[in-house]
Amino acid sequence: MFSKQVTDSKVYQWFEERLEVQEIADDITSKYVPPHVNIFYCLGGITLVCFLIQFATGFAMTFYYKPTVTEAFTSVEYIMNEVNFGWLIRSVHRWSASMMVLMMILHVFRVYLTGGFKKPRELTWIVGVIMAVITVSFGVTGYSLPWDQVGYWAVKIVSGVPAAIPVVGDQMVELLRGGASVGQTTLTRFYSIHTFVLPWLMAVFMLLHFLMIRKQGISGPL
């Protein structure tokens, strides 16, 4: 993988002696790819790219976004109208969010239709389903952050859904809202979930997903 000029350098030799870089590189580049693999097997990778775009653009917006009920909408307007390329960053964030959901759905269909969920890949499928739930949760929590009329009522409806669950429903609603009604605590919790909890969960499950795919390989044709 590496040229002779690189492998002969002292820097490379230093890392090779400690980490066996060449063995790692050979393992990555020599993995067998079945001949039946086509463009539809790239849908999972495209979903990953969308997630990375989401992470980068979302991180950029945290420098300007203010998660308070009085300033959230104003800060979003500021990002769109005053920040250099802010309109582009937020637009890319929204577009890649929609693309991520679409690619995730298509990826799930591809795996199901080609039997990629069958033994011995059941755990890979389960982890993938968990990531699908996390992806939808990203959309639900992110939708509320501008705190406009659409965001407010979306939060009110979504956070009220668990009330239908027997015994623990009301407690779950109060946990989501941070109180009896939707307000500042609700926005703070949704912001924390969207920018901290869900990204970490997604990163952990993605790592597990990729390690299992790496170990088991790509599923064969039907």
UniProtKB/Swiss-Prot annotation:
**Main localization of the protein?**
membrane
The record's keywords, sorted A to Z, are:
Electron transport, Heme, Iron, Membrane, Metal-binding, Photosynthesis, Thylakoid, Transmembrane, Transmembrane helix, Transport
To which species is this protein native?
Gloeothece citriformis (strain PCC 7424)
The coenzyme or cofactor needed here is:
heme b; heme c
Membrane topology for this entry? Multi-pass membrane protein
Q: Where is the protein found, in the record's own terms? A: Cellular thylakoid membrane
Query: What Gene3D superfamilies does the database record attribute to this sequence?
Result: Cytochrome Bc1 Complex, Chain C
Q: What else is on record for this protein? A: Heme 1 (or BH or b566) is high-potential and absorbs at about 566 nm, and heme 2 (or BL or b562) is low-potential and absorbs at about 562 nm.
Complexes and interactors: The 4 large subunits of the cytochrome b6-f complex are cytochrome b6, subunit IV (17 kDa polypeptide, PetD), cytochrome f and the Rieske protein, while the 4 small subunits are PetG, PetL, PetM and PetN. The complex functions as a dimer.
Describe the family membership recorded for this protein in Swiss-Prot or TrEMBL.
Belongs to the cytochrome b family. PetB subfamily.
Q: Where are the transmembrane segments?
A: 39-59, 97-117, 123-143, 193-213
GO BP, sorted A to Z: photosynthesis; respiratory electron transport chain
Protein name from the UniProt record: Cytochrome b6
Q: Which InterPro entries match?
A: Cyt_b/b6_N, Cyt_B6_PetB, Cytb/b6-like_sf, Cytochrome_b_N_euk/bac, Di-haem_cyt_TM
Q: Which residues bind heme b 2?
A: H93, H194
Q: Name one Pfam family in it.
A: Cytochrome_B
Q: What are the recorded GO MF terms, alphabetically?
A: electron transporter, transferring electrons within cytochrome b6/f complex of photosystem II activity; metal ion binding; oxidoreductase activity
Gene Ontology cellular-component terms for this entry are:
plasma membrane-derived thylakoid membrane
Q: What does this protein do?
A: Component of the cytochrome b6-f complex, which mediates electron transfer between photosystem II (PSII) and photosystem I (PSI), cyclic electron flow around PSI, and state transitions.
Quick one: which residues bind heme c?
A: C42
